[in-house]
């Protein structure tokens, strides 16, 4: 079990770093929109920005939202490299959650990866609006023998 948990947390951390790194490939247009290489845009002045709640506490996530679709997956990155949130979903309706990386929350790196038996996640899609909910797992380095489980909710609109 410890090995599966370690793999899940490490995979989520790599996912967050990778997607956040990819999100820096942006160009700004004159209309105030950010366009990724894949053509997905996120308006920085949009009234309904991303919402991230972990363990019942609203997380103040700042930065852009970058959504790309490739190989049947929707990759969602929110925020920057240091505080980034990332998710990979299938592009079906309803989408299936493949992985979620929530980054470091109070000293615990939290994540979910399907197929590991650790945590759970589900997603709904309404147009370009996604809602991802579940339970992420992590390791508190102050007590590494005791896995940490925290509920999460992510709401984001890809445009």
UniProtKB/Swiss-Prot annotation:
Alphabetically sorted, this entry's keywords are:
Cell membrane, Cell wall, Disulfide bond, Glycoprotein, Host cytoplasm, Lipoprotein, Membrane, Palmitate, Secreted, Signal, Transport, Virulence
Record localization: Cell membrane; Secreted, Cell wall; Cell surface; Secreted
What phenotype has been reported when the gene encoding this protein is knocked out?
No visible phenotype in culture. Grows less well than wild-type in human monocyte-derived macrophages (MDM) over 7 days; increased human monocyte MHC class II expression, decreased interleukin 1-beta secretion from monocytes and MDM. No growth in C57BL/6 mice over 40 days, even in mice lacking gamma interferon.
> Lipid (S-diacylglycerol cysteine) linked to which residue positions?
22
Signal sequence extent: 1-21
Q: Where is this region: Prevents bacterial uptake by a human macrophage-like cell line?
A: 41-60
Q: Which cysteines are joined by disulfide bonds?
A: 67-158
The record describes its post-translational modification as: Triacylated with a thioether-linked diacylglycerol with C16 and C19 on Cys-22 and an amide-linked C16 fatty acid. Modified by Lgt on Cys-22 with an S-linked diacylglycerol with a mixture of C16, C18 and C19 fatty acids (palmitic, stearic and tuberculostearic acid), signal peptide is removed by LspA, modifed by Lnt with an amide-linked mixture of C16 and C19 fatty acids, expressed in M.bovis.
> Biotechnological application?
A disrupted strain immunizes mice against subsequent infection with wild-type H37Rv as well as the M.bovis vaccine strain BCG.
Question: Is-annotated flag, keyword Signal?
Answer: yes
| Region: Disordered, residue numbers | 24-51
- Note the topology in the membrane: Lipid-anchor
Anything noted about its domains? Forms a U-shaped beta-half-barrel with a large hydrophobic cavity.
What name goes with this protein? Lipoprotein LpqH
Its source organism is Mycobacterium tuberculosis (strain ATCC 25618 / H37Rv)
Q: Which gene encodes it?
A: lpqH
């Amino acid at each position: 079990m410890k090995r599966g948990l370690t793999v899940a947390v490490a995979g989520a951390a790599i996912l967050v770093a990778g997607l956040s790194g990819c999100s820096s490939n942006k160009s700004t247009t004159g209309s105030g929109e950010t366009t990724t290489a894949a053509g997905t845009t996120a308006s920085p002045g949009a009234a309904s920005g991303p919402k991230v709640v972990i363990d019942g506490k609203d997380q103040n996530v700042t930065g852009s939202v970058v959504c790309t679709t490739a190989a049947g997956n929707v990759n969602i990155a929110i925020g920057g490299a240091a505080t980034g949130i990332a998710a990979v979903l299938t592009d079906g309706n309803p989408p299936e959650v493949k992985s979620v990386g929530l980054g470091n929350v109070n000293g615990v790196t939290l994540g979910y990866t399907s197929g590991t038996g650790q945590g759970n996640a589900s997603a709904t899609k309404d147009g370009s609006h996604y809602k991802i909910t579940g339970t992420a797992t992590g390791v508190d380095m102050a007590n590494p023998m005791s896995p940490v489980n925290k509920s999460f909710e992510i709401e984001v609109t890809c445009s």
